[in-house]
Amino acid sequence: MALLNTPVLAAATAVSFGFYLAGLFVYRVFYHRLSHIPGPRLAAFTVYYQSYYDFFPHQGQFLWKLVELHKAYGPIIRIGPDEVHVNDARFYKEMYGSSVHKRNKSPIWYWMDGLGAVGDQSMFITLDHDHHRLRKAGLGTYFSKRKVQELEPRVKEKVLLLRQRLLERAGRGAINLKDAFGGMALDIITQYCFNQCMGALDRDDLGREWNQLMAAGVKINPFARTFPTVARTLLRLPKWVLGVSGMVSTTGEFLDLADRLSANARNEAIRDLQEGKYTLTDDADSRTVLHSMMRSDVLPEHEKGERRLQADGMTLIAAGFDTTSRTLTVVFYHLLAKPAMRARVLEEIRTLMPTPSSPLPTVAQLEQLPYLTCVIHEGTRLAHGVAGRLVRIAPEEDLVYHNSSDDTEYTIPRGATFGQSSYLVHTDESIYPNPHDFIPERYWSDDGKPTDAERYLVAFGKGTRMCSGINLAFAELYLTIAALLGAVDMKLAPGTTEHDVSLVAELFVGVLPESPGVRVNVVGSL
């Protein structure tokens, strides 16, 4: 009986646990299916290697640790017990698959799966390749280039409203462009998808509060990637409990916003369908993305439930807000900081918009302006879209990566998690010399032909999972640059520097510094 006293039990437990950890270390480092892939042994042993740089004490810094690891170990590295990271833009297309080569999303990264909230039933969070394909088909052509052109007046209306709001503030102090663009993007995505506008541009702060809310919401990601079960549990708690944690409560507030908008649009779609108001010949202005989904012949009825469609509503708002506003902020900083570049873009715009009061050209017309297009490409590159790695699983095939530098091959077995990061692709010096400089000319050769630089842009992803809203995003970029650059005289406020548009953390999306931001003083109309 004496052997069963507490100190002995504690010691026996500790020794047993130590043997377990030692055995686990030996297995994962030397005998695991990924043991042939180079990388730090500690990363192969535990996911908490990532957490040290991702969550605590260095929040959102693992992306830059990846840069160091690739320099030390080469283009393919093992960064977790069952995860591989590749830094090779030429292998990107193969990694992210096609309709024939299936790619599932990995639950290692998409911690929201199975939560019952935070969009876990959305198309974006859907892990299975075939299930995602079904849900994406339910959107129909709502984000196609033709549909975006059809609904372009909705976008133009908000772009011109932003221009009006900026001119109204002429001589009244500095304006934060990220807030202004965020308010416009929020109004556009809600009007475009739900035919209900958030009204951010009607507020005195141009929707700054909503900007801050959504920026705070992504702060949960490093914590949730480290402790997914804890994060899911917290988000299921009552709202009065969530209020204790600002990080979690802001996520809850964003969910409430998305739920209200998508629920209203879904109810309207149901009424219209019941009353026979919605047909294929309806005026485009009366349609919403929820109308398209509710009317879809592809989606089974259980895919049209309230929670399911609200989940897609949430992800549409989130996806249509941050990346567009961040890209516009990057573009306008560089245009305002570089007068010669600004003058060259304005010269092109003037061929379609001769005076500040001229009608705003169409997106189709603006797409024909080569230098403006190069500026937009460079803006998407340096804004990076989703800066963090997009992880996938190949469920039916092994991937073979050939390292051309030493003529070696590495097999990524089916079922293992792998990914690349847009930040590393976009800062690859072999593709983009001086990668941190804003150089639109890199997309055109001296003989006036496109270069390969555009081919490797991955701000919107690649493959079957690439961003559905790419056409809408480009429409916003073209129209906003033309509307503001062609009519508003503004200057960077003192103290605004390139640091204000440089990524300092990765919380799934790239994060700009906690500075006053890119601020401008509006002088008036040109």
UniProtKB/Swiss-Prot annotation:
InterPro entries: Cyt_P450, Cyt_P450_E_grp-I, Cyt_P450_sf, Cytochrome_P450_monoxygenase. Pathway: Mycotoxin biosynthesis. SUPFAM superfamilies: Cytochrome P450. It is found in: Membrane. GO terms for cellular component: membrane. Heme binds at residue 467. GO terms for molecular function: heme binding; iron ion binding; monooxygenase activity; oxidoreductase activity, acting on paired donors, with incorporation or reduction of molecular oxygen. Cytochrome P450 monooxygenase; part of the gene cluster that mediates the biosynthesis of UCS1025A, a member of the pyrrolizidinone family that acts as a strong telomerase inhibitor and displays potent antibacterial and antitumor properties. These compounds share a hemiaminal-containing pyrrolizidinone core fused with a gamma-lactone, giving a furopyrrolizidine that is connected to a decalin fragment. The polyketide synthase module (PKS) of the PKS-NRPS ucsA is responsible for the synthesis of the polyketide backbone via the condensation of an acetyl-CoA starter unit with 6 malonyl-CoA units. This is Cytochrome P450 monooxygenase ucsK. It comes from Acremonium sp. The lineage of its organism: Eukaryota, Fungi, Dikarya, Ascomycota, Pezizomycotina. The gene is ucsK.
